[in-house]
UniProtKB/Swiss-Prot annotation:
Its main location: cytoplasm. Transmembrane segments: none annotated. Component of the 40S small ribosomal subunit. NCBIfam families: uS10_euk_arch. One of its GO terms (cellular component) is cytosolic small ribosomal subunit. This is Small ribosomal subunit protein uS10. One of its GO terms (biological process) is translation. It comes from Sus scrofa. Signal peptide: none annotated. The modification Phosphothreonine is found at T9. The modification N6-acetyllysine is found at K34, K75. It holds the Pfam family Ribosomal_S10.
Amino acid sequence: MAFKDTGKTPVEPEVAIHRIRITLTSRNVKSLEKVCADLIRGAKEKNLKVKGPVRMPTKTLRITTRKTPCGEGSKTWDRFQMRIPKRLIDLHSPSEIVKQITSISIEPGVEVEVTIADA
């Protein structure tokens, strides 16, 4: 039995496309927005499907303490707070390309968390 040449080239296996969620948190909003813009610019240069940045609610951590250390005197209070904004970026791409995108220089103080799931 002879095999016929159909003229078709063998089909190459496609690279698995994952849904990648990048979570960015920082205390400084300007540096957070700069890193978001850099990530999105890098993803669009590679022609990836990008969703975001999604602005999540800002966490506000509050501490209220008495000013006086001994407890005597007028009851005056200090109020301290720290705001932590959060951004989400969703990408649909192979994980190798995401390694290239996330290898950009990230501002100090910005935490990056990458979660990979099947598309």
